[in-house]
């Protein structure tokens, strides 16, 4: 019996193939032939879903971002106070990255090889993380109006700082030590959330 594969499954396999190929050869050296070989599909199937390998990489980046956002959101919703939310969110984020090191290295580093479009989707992803951070801070402000709200610029600075620590761990092949970032990342965000309006 011939296996019936849905269009969603084909797309998922192609993105998995992209992730595996880039992890093995780097984005610049990856070809569409590499992607379809690892995805076990034809080139025709590839072009039915993506116009180019760049489009495939950008789709992979966006899908992985969606998954990370959902993991963090679930961690936040499972916590009962602000301290727990902050710690659980950082832990979930770092554990997800540690569990998928090759994919995350592709996304953190290789996305830059996609040029201006890569920067655009990376910036959009960082904005989504910053928005989630601000929403978490807004919950605290609702409960404690004297607490200072997180501005858009401050949220982006926090996201950028934490991601830079992650990038350093990746570049120095210390992904196994990634959870050590949890403490400074949590301390940074808690310090920001602890500020009161009177301190401005």
Question: Where in this protein do the model-derived segments appear?
Answer:
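Amphipathic alpha-helical packing segments from all-alpha helical-bundle domains
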Residues: 116-141, 149-164, 180-183, 187
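Generic hydrophobic, amphipathic alpha-helix propensity
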Residues: 7-18, 35, 60-68
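Helix-turn-helix
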Residues: 13, 21-55, 59
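Amphipathic alpha-helical segments that line or abut small-molecule/effector binding pockets
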Residues: 16, 83-98, 156, 160, ...
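N-terminal intrinsically disordered/low-complexity leader segments
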Residues: 1-9, 141-148, 197-200
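Hydrophobic alpha-helical connector segments
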Residues: 59, 74-102, 147
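Amphipathic C-terminal alpha-helical segment
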Residues: 96, 135, 152-176, 188-200
């Amino acid at each position: 019996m011939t296996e019936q594969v849905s269009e969603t499954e084909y797309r998922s396999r192609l993105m998995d193939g992209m992730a595996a190929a880039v992890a093995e050869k780097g984005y610049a050296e990856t070809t569409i032939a590499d992607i379809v070989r690892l995805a076990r599909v034809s080139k025709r199937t590839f072009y039915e879903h993506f116009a180019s390998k760049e489009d495939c990489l950008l789709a992979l980046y966006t899908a992985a971002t969606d998954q990370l956002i959902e993991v963090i959101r679930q961690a936040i919703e499972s916590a009962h106070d602000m301290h727990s939310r902050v710690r659980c969110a950082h832990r979930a984020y770092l554990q997800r990255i540690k569990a998928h090191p090759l994919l995350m290295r592709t996304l953190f580093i290789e996305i830059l090889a996609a040029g201006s479009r890569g920067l655009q989707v990376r910036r959009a992803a960082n904005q989504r993380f910053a928005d989630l951070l601000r929403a978490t801070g807004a919950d605290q402000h609702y409960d404690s109006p004297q607490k200072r709200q997180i501005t858009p610029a401050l949220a982006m600075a926090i996201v950028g700082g934490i991601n830079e620590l992650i990038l350093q761990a990746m570049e120095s092949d210390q992904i196994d030590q990634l959870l050590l970032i949890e403490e400074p990342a949590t301390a940074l965000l808690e310090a920001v959330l602890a500020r009161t309006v009177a301190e401005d």
